[in-house]
UniProtKB/Swiss-Prot annotation:
Any GO BP annotation: cytochrome complex assembly
GO cellular component annotations of the record: chloroplast thylakoid membrane; plasma membrane
Lineage, broadest ranks: Eukaryota, Viridiplantae, Streptophyta, Embryophyta, Tracheophyta
Name of protein: Cytochrome c biogenesis protein CcsA
Main location: plastid
Topological type in the membrane: Multi-pass membrane protein
Family: Belongs to the CcmF/CycK/Ccl1/NrfE/CcsA family.
GO MF terms, alphabetically ordered: heme binding
Annotated organism of origin: Ranunculus macranthus
Length: 316
């Protein structure tokens, strides 16, 4: 009982902290930066990460297995994964601008996990025989980490497309590490200077060009990491399936959509490394992949069919 109470308390504390972090970030965008608030939001993300880590450890202790056996537990692990992708650059550079993606992702997944829709599967249960394997940790953790990385990378690509294809854009200025719009700018006003076969953007929109390049670079790195996790997850799942069901691949809904997801992001990496294609081409592919991931992740749980329907819930 005490473990369940601690888990409940930590869940609501982390949700409250994330809400405050998002509010602070929006305030910083509206009024540039309020002294001390940016520092508080960074510490808030760290505190939220520790809370989510604590509740996962508590659930692991009283359930006796890694909390990855149903939709509720995988959503909480996905929230933790979003926080991880914030923490890595933060501890490396003592600053991370990824909270614009990771904070909403954390609160969305954690909020859905703790909603009434999943109330019936909040309680930890004994694993079914098929899940009582050492492959559970490797396969499911790699898949959920890949979902978090690919979702973050895809959202960066969506942001890149918005900046590229808007007819009316804004001039961007760098202020304390953030790229902020300071005024309207139409593409017809952008001047290019061609000298010695090198193309330079006008100084007026130099930061916009920098932002596009950084978004392209960040999305490529994050998606590449997610693709690696996805590949490891699929391969470990195939080995696990062979041990459990006697076949490496069965083409059930989850496996089919995992293969589609892998194919989409393989195409992304191909277009990204092809120098004859523009960055917008790969960004479009990644944007499509964003929706494919959610179909792959929630599809089987909503339908409740196939070999991967453990922990699914019924819509009433």
């Amino acid at each position: 009982m005490i473990f369940f109470t601690l888990e409940h308390v930590l869940t609501h504390i982390s949700l409250s902290i994330i809400l405050i972090v998002i509010t602070i970030f929006l305030m910083n965008l509206l009024v540039y930066e309020i002294e001390g608030l940016s520092y508080s939001s960074e510490k808030g993300m760290v505190a939220s990460f520790l809370c989510i880590t604590g509740l996962l450890v508590i659930r692991w202790i009283y359930s006796g297995h890694l909390p990855l056996s149903d939709l509720y537990e995988s959503l909480m692990f996905l929230s933790w994964s979003f926080s991880i992708f914030y923490m890595i650059p933060y501890f490396r550079n003592k600053k991370s601008n990824l909270n614009v993606l990771t904070a909403p992702g954390t609160i969305f997944t954690q909020g859905f996990a703790t909603s009434g829709v999943l109330r019936e599967i909040h309680q930890s249960t004994i694993l079914v025989p098929a899940l009582q394997s050492q492959w559970l940790m490797m396969h499911v953790s790699m898949m959920v980490l890949s979902y978090a990385a690919l979702l973050c990378g895809s959202l960066l690509s969506v942001a890149l497309l918005v900046i590229l294809f808007r007819k009316s854009s804004f001039t961007f200025s760098k202020y304390k590490g953030y790229y902020l719009p300071i005024g309207p700018l139409y593409f017809s006003e952008i001047q290019y200077v061609n000298e010695k076969k090198n193309i330079f953007l006008s100084f007026r929109n130099y930061h916009r060009y920098q932002l596009i390049q950084q978004l392209d670079c960040w999305s490529s790195r994050v998606i590449s990491l997610g693709f690696l996790f996805l590949t490891i997850g699929i391969l470990s799942g195939a080995v696990w399936a062979n041990e459990t069901w006697g076949s490496y691949w069965n083409w059930d809904p989850k496996e089919t959509w995992a293969f589609i997801t892998w194919t989409i992001f393989a195409i992304y990496l191909h277009t990204r490394t092809n120098k004859s294609l523009q960055s917008s081409n790969s960004a479009i592919v990644a944007s499509i992949g964003f929706f494919i991931i959610w179909i792959c992740y929630f599809g089987v749980n909503l339908l409740g069919i196939g070999l991967h329907s453990y922990g699914s819930f019924a819509i009433t």
